[in-house]
Regions:
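Catalytic Zn2+-binding segment of zinc metalloproteases
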Residues: 141, 145-150, 158-175
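Bacterial Sec-dependent N-terminal signal peptides
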Residues: 1-33
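Post-HExxH zinc-binding segment in Zn-dependent metallohydrolases
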Residues: 178-211
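Envelope-exposed proteins and targeting segments
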Residues: 94, 113-115, 131-135, 147-152
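Catalytic zinc-binding patch centered on the HExxH motif and its immediate surroundings
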Residues: 118-133
Length: 461
C-alpha cells in the first residue's frame, strides 16, 4: 500500500512539474520578465565573494610558496570580482537545471563535493573552470545548445579540466616561462600546450558522458556551435522595422564583407579557429572508435525542461546585451526569438528601447561606439543588419525609429515600459512640447513607476 501511495504521489509531482513547464512556456509566449537576483544569497556564492577559496592540486611543477600564494590570491581576486559585479545568477531556474545535469555526470564519483556549477550573464559562447572547483557556464552557450547531452558535454569538458589540473598547469608553466629570458618560442609552446589541454578534456569528457548514459556523439556538435556553425532563423528586419513613417527599401541595404574575408585580408590571428578545427577533427575520430550504445540518451531530464531553460537563456541574452549597451546584438537576439515567440510583448518593447538608444548615439554622431562586433561578425544576417544601421542617414534613422516605436506604442498603449520609451522618443525626434502628453500619462498612471521622478521633472522644466 505504501509503495502504491508513493507512486501515486510521484505521478502527481510529475504532473505538476509538466503543468508548470507548460505554464511557463505560455507565459513566455506573452511576455518576459528578466531574472533579478533576489532571496537569500547561497553559501557557495558568498564563499566566492569572501575569497574563501581552496585550491586542490598536486604541486607537480614544484612551485615555491610565493608562487603558490600568488596563484591562490589571483584565483581568489578574479572570482571575487566576477561574483561581486553581479555577473552570476543565483536562486534561478537556469542554475538549478545546470546543476542537475552536473549531478548526473558526477554521480558515483569523488568529485560531487569538489565542483560547483554557476551560470553567468556573459554572452560569449563559452564556459570556464577554476582550480577551486568553480565551473561557470555562460548564458551565451546555453542559448545556443540544442539538447541536454550537449550541455552535459560542455560540463564534462570543464570537469575534465579540473580533474587534470589544467588551471594550475597553465599558471605554473606560465610562471616557469617568465624565468626563461629571450625565449622566442614561448608563445608557440604555450599555445600548443593549451590545445593539448583541450584535446585531453574532450577525451575525458566522452568517458564521463558514456558513464552517465548521455549521447557522447553530441560532443562534436558542441564544438560546431562554439565555432558558430549553426543555423539561426531570425525574422526579416526589413519587414519588421518598416512602418508608414519609413519603409526599408533595397537602396537602404548593403552586403558587408564577410567575417572569413576579413580574417584573410586583415591578417587577424586565426589560432583560436584553427584550435577548434583540430579539436573537432580529433573528437570525431575518437568517437568513430567508440562502439555506439543504443541506450545513450540526448535527454535524461525532461526534454521540455531543457527547451524552457534554453529559452530563458535566450531571453536573458537579449536583456544582458542591452544592459551592456550592445544594442545591435540585443535587437538581433530579439529578432531570432520572435520566430518562436511572435507575440511576446517584452521582445517588441525591448527592440523599441534598443532603437531609441541607437538613435541617441546617431544624433550625437558617435554611433560607431556601439558597434562592438564590428569586423567580428560570423552570422550573415547579423552582419547585414549592422551594415544597414551603419548606412542609414540621420534623418532616415529618426523616421525609422519613430515609426517603429509609434507602432509598438499603439499595440501596448498602457504598458509602463512602452509608454516611457514613446515619451522619450517623441522628445528626441521632435521636442518636449510634443512629448508632454506622454509624460503626463506616465505620471498619472505610474505613481510608483521606475521613471516617475524623471517624468515629473521633465514636466516641471
Amino acid at each position: 500500500m505504501k509503495v502504491i501511495k508513493t507512486i501515486y504521489q510521484l505521478s502527481i509531482f510529475v504532473a505538476i512539474l509538466f503543468f508548470c513547464s507548460n505554464l511557463t512556456f505560455a507565459q513566455l509566449a506573452e511576455d518576459y520578465h528578466p531574472i533579478k537576483l533576489k532571496g537569500e544569497i547561497p553559501s557557495d556564492f558568498l564563499k566566492r565573494i569572501k575569497g574563501d577559496v581552496q585550491l586542490k592540486y598536486e604541486n607537480s611543477l614544484r612551485l615555491n610558496s610565493v608562487q603558490k600564494e600568488q596563484f591562490r590570491v589571483g584565483t581568489e581576486y578574479i572570482l571575487r570580482d566576477i561574483f561581486q559585479q553581479g555577473n552570476i545568477y543565483f536562486n534561478d531556474p537556469m542554475t538549478d537545471y545546470v546543476r542537475k545535469v552536473g549531478d548526473n555526470l558526477l554521480y558515483g564519483t569523488d568529485l560531487a563535493n569538489d565542483i560547483t556549477f554557476f551560470v553567468s550573464r556573459f554572452n560569449v559562447t563559452n564556459a570556464t573552470t577554476w582550480q577551486d572547483g568553480t565551473v561557470i557556464v555562460n548564458i551565451g552557450l546555453i542559448a545556443c545548445l540544442e539538447n541536454e547531452a550537449q550541455l552535459a558535454f560542455a560540463l564534462a569538458h570543464e570537469i575534465s579540466h579540473y580533474i587534470q589540473q589544467h588551471p594550475y598547469l597553465q599558471y605554473g608553466r606560465f610562471v616557469k616561462k617568465q624565468q626563461v629570458e629571450n625565449n622566442s618560442n614561448v608563445f608557440v609552446q604555450n599555445t600548443d600546450r593549451t590545445l593539448n589541454y583541450e584535446l585531453e578534456a574532450d577525451s575525458i569528457a566522452i568517458n564521463l558522458l558514456k558513464k552517465a548514459k548521455y549521447n557522447y556523439n553530441e560532443g562534436s556538435k558542441v564544438l560546431r556551435i562554439v565555432r558558430r556553425e549553426y543555423e539561426r532563423d531570425a525574422i526579416s528586419f526589413v519587414r519588421y522595422l518598416s512602418s508608414d513613417k519609413f519603409e526599408i527599401k533595397e537602396i537602404n541595404l548593403c552586403k558587408p564583407i564577410s567575417y572569413q574575408d576579413y580574417m584573410e585580408n586583415e591578417s587577424v590571428s586565426s589560432k583560436s579557429i584553427l584550435s577548434l578545427d583540430i579539436r573537432q577533427r580529433k573528437l570525431i575520430k575518437r568517437l568513430s572508435r567508440v562502439e555506439y550504445q543504443v541506450s545513450l540518451k540526448n535527454y535524461i531530464l525532461a526534454k521540455d525542461l531543457f527547451k524552457k531553460i534554453q529559452s530563458i537563456a535566450r531571453f536573458e541574452l537579449v536583456e544582458q546585451t542591452f544592459l551592456s549597451s550592445n544594442y545591435l546584438r540585443s535587437i538581433y537576439e530579439a529578432l531570432s526569438l520572435l520566430n518562436d515567440f511572435p507575440k511576446n510583448k517584452y521582445l517588441h518593447i525591448k527592440v523599441s528601447e534598443n532603437l531609441y538608444y541607437i538613435n541617441s548615439y546617431n544624433d550625437l554622431s558617435i554611433i560607431d561606439r556601439i558597434f562592438f562586433d564590428q569586423k567580428k561578425i560570423e552570422d550573415e544576417v547579423y552582419a547585414d543588419f549592422c551594415c544597414f544601421i551603419n548606412k542609414l542617414t540621420k534623418e532616415d534613422m529618426r523616421k525609422m525609429v519613430f515609426g517603429f516605436v509609434q507602432q509598438q506604442y499603439q499595440n501596448y498603449p498602457s504598458d509602463e515600459r512602452m509608454l516611457i520609451i514613446m515619451a522619450k522618443t517623441v522628445e528626441m525626434v521632435y521636442d518636449m512640447e510634443y512629448a508632454k502628453s506622454y509624460y503626463e500619462k506616465y505620471v498619472k498612471l505610474y505613481v510608483d513607476g521606475e521613471h516617475f521622478l524623471m517624468a515629473k521633472k521633465k514636466l516641471e522644466q
